Amino acid sequence: MGCVNSKQTVSVTPAIDHSGVFRDNVCSGSGRIVVEDLPPVTETKLLSWWSKSGKKSSSKKSGSELGSDFGELSESGRASSNCRSESVSFRLGNLSKYLEAEQVAAGWPAWLSNVAGEAIHGWVPFRSDAFEKLEKIGQGTYSSVFRARETETGRIVALKKVRFDNFEPESVRFMAREILILRKLNHPNIIKLEGIVTSKLSCSIHLVFEYMEHDLTGLLSSPDIDFTTPQIKCYMKQLLSGLDHCHARGVMHRDIKGSNLLVNNEGILKVADFGLANFCNASGNKQPLTSRVVTLWYRPPELLLGATEYGASVDLWSVGCVFAELLIGKPVLQGRTEVEQLHKIFKLCGSPPEDYWKKSKLPHAMLFKPQQHYDGCLRETLKLKGLSDADINLIETLLSIQPHKRGTASTALVSQYFTSKPFACDPSSLPVYSPSKEIDAKHREDTTRKKISGNGRRGTESRKPTRKPPAFAKLAPAEDVRHHSQKFQKRNGHSVHNSIDSDSTLFEKMQKPSNHEKDEASHVKNASQGDVPFSGPLQVSVSSGFAWAKRRKDDICVRSHNRSLSRGHIPNLLGPSPAFSENTDVDSKNNEKEKEEKHGERTDSQDREAYEMLKLSMLKKWRQLERPDSFGGSDEYHSQELSLELYQREEKAAKLGHLGYEDNDEKIEFSGPLLSKSYGVDELLERHERQIRQLVRKSWFQKGKKQGK
């Protein structure tokens, strides 16, 4: 970092003169301190001397005395002959405290230098104003990634803000482990840590990385990108090369997936996000590891079974999942829970033999052991996808249930897949794509979801929805939405909608967004017949949403009225539907004016008469619903919506106390749906649904009243 370009840097301090004063070597005015290198021999002597003398040391030594002792080292890093003389005495017992103080003086926060000083060994932090954040480009469990610009040079970098608790030493050590591992690795296919942004008083840090334009998840999800076999081999070769470098240095990544494999415009793939990485257990150190690592779709079976002793083979399973995803175009193992993920693995790759379960010491082995043995169908499944034998052989090796059969990254690089034609292409020959990351893929999915929701509508809505859908509407997945066919009739030059869904409700209508409001439609979902929130069986098709009203002088049969009632049959009372009308606001206002001119103002007596007729009609419907033999396809009540004119009439009637649900003798809920008592729908859920519909109706009424003014 800064001017410390060598990974072999050992010195922990800036150069110090004999007076104990820091001698700052400024690089291009950046204020970064040059750290001199010490040869390995001197480093070994210092460390051994520290370990032997540190415990015995009790006296303190001033900074100037220590400075003069360090001054015996020449600026070239070579120890002078006097270092070996007995007259030179290092009081290394307090050296660690001196180094902590030196790191704080260099700009590091005390909570970091006290707990994880080795992670920032020899580095100087960037200033907080050295970079300008532009936008977020990634989001992880423990971090957020931003695109940023270096203020001095204008260079684009990636800033990773790590989440941790600086008051908890273990949390700080967990964060610092990523820094230690990244400093240990140096490979073209491993992301490079360029520095750290923090200050003495800061409670957070930002890691500075080189900027990469793409990740594999974003490229795979792009509809315009289709990888060829040489391109896939190129990416896989780079991935395995980077992992081979990690494993050779005892590092497990433990979170290999498409979004952590970054690609730049030069076609170079780099393994990133070492937040869950750890060192492999040495033969003499069997410290238990956690099994709660690796994203679920890429997690190997031994971790799903609770293994606490594992090695680099966990990364190879994840590589196999990524490889199959590159070839097929989507993840091959998409479980929603750990149990389901394990079941999918056994069905595809086969379950382990009986000896594996007997010898296994995994905590969850007997708990998750399948009752029947699975032979696996991986080869047959991949052959159906048109993959070659070389492709299938490598995938089968990487996706072996038993870890020792997966081989290593180096053996995978010399497999038949890479040695047969067509060979891997050169990274420089890869096409330059538009920036594509996982977050871009999510945006595309959201846009597609909005389009699908918008296509469920045939008409355009001239007014914005007045409220968000209920909470239970947000829980319905998009794939559960079923679209019902709708028919339209042309009347008076306008499109009039007749629903053919027998039990469509107001909840359904509130779910359907307009085509020109796609920006607001991300939280609105379509509903269907099966989405009615009652737990009981709905065997009666009834009207819902708003009550019906119709002024009629002649008595008409209720059954024929139910069959024929539609907006076309009552043009004098029902205005254009707010949810399905294709008219604009201007057309709606013109229609209202025409109706007012044609019919004139309603008197209070007429309103009362109309509402009495309405209540009478609903009572007849209720009695009809009491008879089981009256249920039939011809008795479906078509849902209608109340116009502004009807609402005004109801408002006047409400003032006179003639609302049906306010009568003490006959209580009828006009917000529907009306269900037969004989079918015993849960009373609590029905009351909850009724309250929701009343609130929704009130919001629609209020909006209609405002627009009428």
From Swiss-Prot:
One of its GO terms (cellular component) is plasma membrane. Residues 437-449, 509-523, 586-609 have a biased composition (Basic and acidic residues). Residues 484-494 have a biased composition (Basic residues). Keywords: ATP-binding, Kinase, Lipoprotein, Myristate, Nucleotide-binding, Plant defense, Serine/threonine-protein kinase, Transferase. A lipid is attached at residue 2 (N-myristoyl glycine). Disruption phenotype: Impaired in beta-aminobutyric acid (BABA)-induced sterility. Altered BABA-induced resistance (BABA-IR) against bacteria (e.g. P.syringae) and oomycetes (e.g. H.parasitica) associated with reduction in priming for salicylate (SA)-dependent defense responses (e.g. trailing necrosis and pathogenesis-related PR-1 gene expression). Reduced primed to be primed phenotype in transgenerationally primed plants exposed to a second BABA-priming. One of its GO terms (biological process) is positive regulation of defense response to bacterium. The active site is at 255 (proton acceptor). Residues 131-418 form the Protein kinase domain. PROSITE patterns: PROTEIN_KINASE_ATP, PROTEIN_KINASE_DOM, PROTEIN_KINASE_ST. InterPro entries: CDK (IPR050108), Kinase-like_dom_sf (IPR011009), Prot_kinase_dom (IPR000719), Protein_kinase_ATP_BS (IPR017441), Ser/Thr_kinase_AS (IPR008271). Pfam families: Pkinase. Residues 53-80, 434-536, 566-609 are annotated as: Disordered. Coiled coil: none annotated. ATP binds at residues 137-145, 160. Belongs to the protein kinase superfamily. Ser/Thr protein kinase family. Required for beta-aminobutyric acid (BABA)-induced resistance (BABA-IR) against bacteria (e.g. P.syringae) and oomycetes (e.g. H.parasitica) via priming for salicylate (SA)-dependent defense responses such as pathogenesis-related PR-1 gene expression and trailing necrosis. Involved in BABA-mediated sterility. Necessary for the inheritance of BABA-priming to next generation, especially for the primed to be primed phenotype which consists in an enhanced second BABA-priming in transgenerationally primed plants. This is Protein IMPAIRED IN BABA-INDUCED STERILITY 1. The lineage of its organism: Eukaryota, Viridiplantae, Streptophyta, Embryophyta, Tracheophyta. The gene is IBS1.
